[in-house]
Amino acid sequence: MRKFTLSLMHAFLPAGGRNALPGKRGVSRALLGLSLGMALTPLAGAATSAQQQLLEQVRLGEATHREDLVRQSLYRLELIDPNDPQVIAARFRYLLRQGDSDGAQKLLDRLAQLAPESTAYQSSRTAMLLSTPQGRQSLQEARLLATTGHTEQAIASYDKLFKGYPPEGELAVEYWTTVAKLPARRHEAINQLQKINAVSPGNNALQNALAQLLFASGRRDEGFAVLKQMAKSSTGRSAASAIWYQQIKDLPVSDASVKALQDYLTQFSEGDSVSAARAQLSEQQKQLADPAFRARSQGIAAVNAGEGGKAIAQLQQAVSARQDDSEAVGALGQAYSQRGDRARAVAQFEKALAMAPHSSSRDKWESLLKVNRYWLLIQQGDAALKANNLAQAERFYQQARAVDNTDSYAVLGLGDVAMARKDNAAAERYYQQTLRMDSGNTNAVRGLANLYRQQSPQKAAAFIASLSASQRRSIDDIERSLENDRLAQQAETLESEGKWAQAAELHRRRLALDPGSVWVTYRLSRDLWQAGQHAQADAQMRSLAQQKPNDPEQVYAYGLYLSGSDRDRAALAHLNTLPTSQWNSNIQELAGRLQSNQVLESANRLRDSGKEREAEALLRQQPPSTRIALTLADWAQQRGDNAAARAAYDAVLAREPGNVDAMLGRVEIDIAQGDNAAARAQLAALPASQITSINMQRRVALAQLQLGDITAAARTFNRITPQAKAQPPSMESAMVLRDAAAFQAQTGEPQRALETYKDAMVAAAITPVRPQDNDTFTRLTRNDEKDDWLKRGVRSDAAELYRQQDLNVTLAHDYWGSSGTGGYSDLKAHTTMLQVDAPWSDGRAFFRTDMVNMDVGRFSTDADGKYDNNWGTCTLEKCSGHRSQADTGASVAVGWQNETWRWDIGTTPMGFNVVDVVGGVSYSDDIGPLGYTLNAHRRPISSSLLAFGGQKDASSNTGTKWGGVRANGGGVSLSYDKGEANGVWASLSGDQLSGKNVEDNWRVRWMTGYYYKVINENNRRVTVGLNNMIWHYDKDLSGYSLGQGGYYSPQEYLSFAVPVMWRQRTENWSWELGGSVSWSHSRNRTMPRYPLMNLIPADYQEDARDQTNGGGSSQGFGYTARALIERRVTANWFVGTAVDIQQAKDYTPSHLLLYVRYSAAGWQGDMDLPPQPLVPYADW
């Protein structure tokens, strides 16, 4: 722009040049020039447009060999911008054509200085080279290669010659026309020729070549547009007309061909092609007036346009009108082919070839016949394969392969047949052959991936990794599925280990691979719930429900999730969000189960509250149901009503002969009734294929155990225990693990049983994470008011076994005594106890030692230092010496106990005057709700020093030892307590009482009581009751004289007491506070003071016979008070204390106790309720 403006200004400057000093008139001319220059500045755009037009005229002149037009245009261009590289290049080409090589070289040098990187310079340099003999020779060689069909070599020669910059004009057209002969570069060549055409309008040779290339490439509209450009040129019009007509004259007769002729005639009005077109147009219009011909032509046109499916009716009409028209028959075959109707297509092509074997369309028909035969056989093979007719499918694929052995789909079909036959080797071979024939056959890639996936995920992954990117994309669903399977397997392993949070993270990754997956979301939510992340778990399922509100699968999964987290009512409500008409069988089954659960839940609440009859009535009101019938049978079985249970099971089997639950129930009844032979027969008859659930297998294992088949029971439990661990928490899996643990403990594997109880805690949803240490484990055994029966059972069973396996050491000190007469009944005693308890077999063994010190005070003496108390023989002859009466000794004992048996053997304190071996054995069991214990024993009477350890008569008298009374006998005790508000107990015992130098005696004692639980909670109980005791001793030997026993022994004793007891425990404390008020009546007969005359010296026997202990009766009130408290200091150490105050008539001493207990394994479970301090061995 600036150059153009200055040039105009220069035209108006003084003749002396720009540096000349203008005169007045010169100044005016200069100012005028400046004004004109400024005024012409906005016209720069027009000048540029004019410049372009002039350059186009230069190219037009070059193309038409109009050198005069070139000269005129260059003159004007050089006035506008003489330094424009394009202008210089055009002048360069002009001089070169004129043979002025020197002038051309000067311009080339100038162009090198002005624009050395420009295309104008590069193409000019190439043109200069071509003007040399060597350049012309190289150009001729390239042209010869192109003419003789060596296109690639020709292009290489051109590129070497042009160095990437072909000269402008005809050589550029020549070069790109040659490049267009290469199919891979045709599009590039056409684009370059179009660019040249855009800047070189009127170049007929270029436009001719470009139009032909566009038509050959199927770009007809663009080709006709170029011909329209040619038609504007008088020199190119004739050629354009000929090319145009050549493109339309052979079109099938149709409306489209008529329109094409009409469009042509609007462009051209003279010439041979125009005459021919007019005649052809007239003829086609006449033909199209015939409906049959129109249908034929329109059908053929549609087929040629690839829309044969729409032309079938028209072509059928044409064939019906002219049955010898082979072209119409062939076109109909093409139409069927395009519609995919291979069978009809084959028939039409065969017909066309038979009608016109020498038709110009023969090659096309034969090719299409081959293609359609091939794909027809492929379709038939696919259909046979889908119908699982593998032999027929194989025949079709083999026939297809014979038709065309170059296409891969017949080989692929053979691979699919081999796959269906599970012939993996053949399938792999065919699939690999398919890929060698066509690496892009994604079905073969998929077939191999699935084949390797069946063999191992690792092999499939390795195969996928070896694929190209495009092949891998074609089976990305399989790759995602493999990754999903891998993550699912890892998650399942973590779930089996109770690592719910880690499993949930893997499910998150699975959900990213398959967004919106119902069951992946379900498993993710379930694991989050188990990990304690309840809000997140619920949010996942809510989001799924929002995404798929009407999806039955979602509704079922959400209901299952809610049901699995003990939200049956919410689960049922969610199922009802979907219209029942859309419920599938899964939803129907779940809804029925949830509704049944609600009924059973109500019935169980009634039963648990003691209203079993009402519970049964509720169930019997429901529609007949196998589940309810089995529940009623189970209840009858539990209460021992085997006849009713058997009848219920028989009723179920009458409706469902193969019901395994009922069959197992009958096995259990036979076992309960002792009919082991029938039970074994029933157990053997169970259909193994139907015992699929782990709960059924659990019941089978228990039956095997009860029948004594320990090996079979072990096999069953070993099989189902890992399955139960792998399952999500459920009642079924928890029951399996609970019973497996009990079995392991019973068969001598207590430590393994404890580990299984840990798994049972997870399965019962007591904890989401398996406990890893004793403190955590035992803390989980603590009771919870919210627990159902199963959780309570798992906790208590685990606690019982753990404590049975623990080693305990207890040290206690008991101070006890009662007031009386110094020297024999004013008792003050200390007992220090040490007991070690350890596991042995299925019970606990213990070692016990008691250090006992008993002091009964001092005798009061007269002035002579003598005493005549009713002790020894002092009433016969005053005694002297041995005023202080005390004794110390140590006892030892060992024993063992389990749930049924208990025994011990030991000694009375060694060091006492009388030492004996003592002990006992007992057996406990249940008869329905009634518990009972039978016992046999030899126990000391420890209420006085005389009765327990014996005393020695004063040495001033006989010096005889006597006392040490032992009770030898047995008894039975009964109890009734179902855990409800009321309880009853009773005890009956009989003993032979004997001692060293003591008159023999015997006794019978009856004791019974009733209690009512005012508060009956897991950790707090308040009871009030009524107790009754009736005793009878044959003789009253309560005196302390020689031959007496020193123990309370009324001939009649009756008492009633009202005890009140408060027991409670907290996390680390446990206590019992209680007391009673009582009324008692007793009667004693008058008895000889010295019942054994052989112990009395002869001199005193007459006097002794005259002395008696007077009888009589008495009655009155008494009371007791008791306080006992225990504290857990650590998991291993416990301390406690107790106070027991007695104010009664039965020689019962009061106690003060302190103790400490050590647990080797540690215990963080429930505190004992009430606390269990040591009891002196003498009082067992």
From Swiss-Prot:
Which keywords does this Swiss-Prot/TrEMBL entry list?
Answer: Cellulose biosynthesis, Repeat, Signal, TPR repeat
Protein name, per record = Cellulose synthase operon protein C
Q: Does the keyword Plastid apply?
A: no
Domain of life, per lineage: Bacteria
What Gene Ontology cellular component terms go with this record?
A: outer membrane
Instruction: Give a short account of what the protein does.
Output: Required for maximal bacterial cellulose synthesis.
Repeat region (TPR), residues: 85-118, 135-168, 292-325, 326-359, 374-407, 408-441, 484-517, 626-659, 694-727, 734-767
Keyword Lipid metabolism in record: no
Q: Which GO terms describe its biological process?
A: cellulose biosynthetic process
SUPFAM superfamilies, sorted:
TPR-like
Signal peptide start and end residues:
1-45
Identify the pathway: Glycan metabolism; bacterial cellulose biosynthesis
Q: Which family does it belong to?
A: Belongs to the AcsC/BcsC family.
Q: Which Gene3D superfamilies match?
A: Tetratricopeptide repeat domain
Its gene? Answer: bcsC
